[in-house]
From Swiss-Prot:
Ni(2+) binds at residues 97, 99, 103, 141. It comes from the Bacteria. One of its GO terms (biological process) is L-methionine salvage from S-adenosylmethionine. SUPFAM superfamilies: RmlC-like cupins. Catalyzes 2 different reactions between oxygen and the acireductone 1,2-dihydroxy-3-keto-5-methylthiopentene (DHK-MTPene) depending upon the metal bound in the active site. Fe-containing acireductone dioxygenase (Fe-ARD) produces formate and 2-keto-4-methylthiobutyrate (KMTB), the alpha-ketoacid precursor of methionine in the methionine recycle pathway. Ni-containing acireductone dioxygenase (Ni-ARD) produces methylthiopropionate, carbon monoxide and formate, and does not lie on the methionine recycle pathway. Belongs to the acireductone dioxygenase (ARD) family. One of its GO terms (molecular function) is nickel cation binding. Its cofactor is Fe(2+); Ni(2+). Keywords: Amino-acid biosynthesis, Dioxygenase, Iron, Metal-binding, Methionine biosynthesis, Nickel, Oxidoreductase. The record marks 105 as: Important to generate the dianion. Binds 1 Fe(2+) cation per monomer. Binds 1 nickel ion per monomer. This is Acireductone dioxygenase.
Amino acid sequence: MATIVKKQETIQDKDQVKAYLTQKGLVYESYKTPESLDLILGQKGLSDAEKEEVLSGLEYRFDQLKKQHGYKANDLVVLHDEVPGISDMLAKFDKLHIHTDEEVRYIIDGSGIFGFIIDGERFEVHVGKGDFISIPANTNHWFTLDQTMRIKAVRYFKDNSGWTPVYVDESKVLINA
């Protein structure tokens, strides 16, 4: 269940989280992951074959999203503290940036933090298992792992060409620091 953390407020109620994110132009849903995947998702790391098994177990969700939003591809990203080069990998995304394509994530294990500056306001969305978030193209955001240092997320794509981060000067988009 996602949690919103703002300057003076924390929002934890699922309906209020969804309403707040909708107001900010983000799509948020909460989906249950199939119990049949619990054992494999409980592992810290996954082989390529295990990733394919997980994606196969979630094919029904991909089929729904293809029909609703036109996604053409998906993959599974597995991040944890023992992934070689994890610090360098996270350093690409923990600074304010945009993408020229939407960024779509379905968190199926672990947790992380998406940060945003929208309409001059800074806030964080703490995501965990079952959270689905779609960030529109050109939205100021960043991502980092939380203290658990572990996340598994399905990424959905319409086109891979918009995936290079374009870094943004925070002082130009933040109204109240």
